[in-house]
From Swiss-Prot:
This is Histone H2A type 1-D. Keywords: Acetylation, Chromosome, Citrullination, DNA-binding, Hydroxylation, Isopeptide bond, Methylation, Nucleosome core, Nucleus, Phosphoprotein, Ubl conjugation. Belongs to the histone H2A family. Residues 7-19 have a biased composition (Basic residues). It comes from Homo sapiens. There is a cross-link at K14, K16, K120 (Glycyl lysine isopeptide (Lys-Gly) (interchain with G-Cter in ubiquitin)). The modification N6-acetyllysine is found at K6. The lineage of its organism: Eukaryota, Metazoa, Chordata, Craniata, Vertebrata. Deiminated on Arg-4 in granulocytes upon calcium entry. Core component of nucleosome. Nucleosomes wrap and compact DNA into chromatin, limiting DNA accessibility to the cellular machineries which require DNA as a template. Histones thereby play a central role in transcription regulation, DNA repair, DNA replication and chromosomal stability. DNA accessibility is regulated via a complex set of post-translational modifications of histones, also called histone code, and nucleosome remodeling. CDD domains: HFD_H2A. Gene3D superfamilies: Histone, subunit A. The modification N6-lactoyllysine is found at K10. The modification N6-crotonyllysine is found at K37, K119, K120, K126.
Amino acid sequence: MSGRGKQGGKARAKAKTRSSRAGLQFPVGRVHRLLRKGNYSERVGAGAPVYLAAVLEYLTAEILELAGNAARDNKKTRIIPRHLQLAIRNDEELNKLLGKVTIAQGGVLPNIQAVLLPKKTESHHKAKGK
């Protein structure tokens, strides 16, 4: 026998995505590809797409958490752009980050200037003073 063939060779391990290795849901491979194709720099390190995917996943989870709370407050089970708008504008840090962003169909925050509200009557205070 010539010793060739497939006996005794190591079986190739099952492929594991970089996202699963990092414990992320966002696609590390796709982020890496987009960083390379985007002409941001000549070279892209191995850790950069993992870090960026983790940051994007965290921000998305944070916004969806707050939007889900806004939807629940409005007794709705589906998140709509209005809920995203309320979630972002009511959170100080997210509002600062996304200050210049317009959300389609988001509406505005309910706000009435204090000057426009009806004045409280002070009839009982004057009666006590006399």
